[in-house]
Design a protein with these regions (language model features):
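An exposure/low-complexity boundary signal
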Residues: 2-19, 182-195, 242-270
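ATP-binding N-terminal substructure of ATP-dependent carboxylate-amine bond-forming enzymes
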Residues: 1-50, 212, 261-272, 280-303
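Active-site nucleotide/adenylate-binding loops and adjacent lid/helix of ATP-dependent enzymes
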Residues: 27-158, 297
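Short beta-strand element of the conserved SAM-dependent methyltransferase core
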Residues: 70, 102, 127-131, 174, ...
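Peripheral (often C-terminal) accessory segments that flank ATP-dependent C-N-forming ligase machineries
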Residues: 204-303
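Short acidic loop-to-beta-strand element that houses the catalytic metal-binding Asp/Glu
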Residues: 66, 171-175
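ATP-dependent carboxylate/phosphate-activation module, predominantly the ATP-grasp catalytic core
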Residues: 107-110, 115-164, 176-223
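Active-site-adjacent "lid" and substrate-binding segments of diverse enzymatic cores
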Residues: 166-169
């Protein structure tokens, strides 16, 4: 499949989309890392800090001030694995971990941004904000219809300085308009909320290094997340019941976000919980209601 999707619950967004031979579109950081040797340095979070002039260092080097934010230097699995706030020098002495780094604890709005890029120049932006819970979890994400001009200006300039020669989708994670992570792929969790024809335009971008998406029918959407407890072996819910829910116009898609044939510990999940499902929708209250219903279905179907 030329659109490389490793999570089977997201292939629904790419089925039936024609992709020319020889064109490979990553939706996964590991695949993107292999595809783009010239630009894969962006997965080194030390360099993300360095290119922005942010104080940073390896574990073993003492920060000049606390608190700091600690995380793995490389993490191609995502989900905030291994990340934490370190409050003091005393705590730092106990928390040092090989392969980890620290950076400033940045405060502000947390935004996930997808940009369509042609030769290092952004041609299209879409921003998503998350309602955070604890320990790396999010309650839901709002896919915004409106722009974020300051993020677009800051990240656009960063792209021009650092990703000349790259054409494709870039995903930024920012807090307070500072880049905390960057990925050479799209946010495949909510591409159905970007509008009809968007995936086809992405294929055209990778095939022709050109962007032509009209984007004249934007609407705000929501990606609502269901978490369960760690260490539980969950079964899948009745697919026929899920199909009935998908017939509702306010619901765009539902993802069951785990491998039933894998042990819970074999999944990359945030410290706070095990992600079971995602409801993408056009109406937040409807999405929250479906999440509650799914939760009841999961508790009723233990493995």
């Amino acid at each position: 499949m030329p659109i490389v999707e490793r999570d089977p619950w997201r292939t629904q967004y790419f089925e039936g989309v024609a992709c020319p031979d020889g064109v490979t579109i990553p939706t996964d950081d590991a695949e993107a890392y292999l595809l783009y040797p010239t630009h894969r340095w962006i997965y080194n979070k030390l360099l993300i800090c360095e290119t922005q002039g942010l104080e940073h260092g390896l574990h073993g080097l003492m920060p000049s001030r606390f608190p700091v934010f600690s995380k793995p230097i490389f993490n191609l699995k995502g989900m905030g694995a291994g990340s934490k706030v370190i409050e003091s020098p005393k705590a730092y002495e106990h928390e040092q971990t090989p392969g980890h780094m620290w950076m400033p604890l940045i405060v502000g709005e947390h935004v996930s941004t997808d940009a369509a890029v042609v030769d290092g120049e952004a041609k299209w932006w879409r921003h998503t904000i998350g309602k955070a819970l604890s320990d790396g979890m999010f309650d839901y994400w709002t896919v915004l219809a409106e722009p974020r001009p300051q993020i677009e200006a800051y990240c656009g300039e960063w792209l021009r300085r650092n990703l000349k020669g790259y054409s494709g989708i870039v995903n930024f994670e920012t807090i307070g308009e500072t880049i905390i992570e960057c990925h050479l792929r799209m946010s495949d969790q909510w591409v159905d909320l970007y509008g009809p024809g968007w995936v086809e335009s992405v294929v055209h971008l990778y095939a022709n290094k050109d962007w032509g998406y009209a984007d004249d029918s934007r609407r705000t959407g929501y990606s609502v997340v269901l978490f369960g407890k760690h260490g539980v072996r969950y079964g899948q819910v009745d697919r026929s019941m899920v199909a009935e829910v998908l017939s509702r116009p306010e619901i765009s898609s539902i993802q069951m976000t785990f491998h039933e044939d894998k042990l819970p510990d074999a999944h990359s999940m945030p410290p706070g919980g095990f992600r079971l499902a995602i409801v993408n929708c056009w109406d937040l209250e409807a999405g929250l209601a479906i999440r509650e219903w799914l939760g009841l279905m999961f508790w009723a179907t233990p493995k």
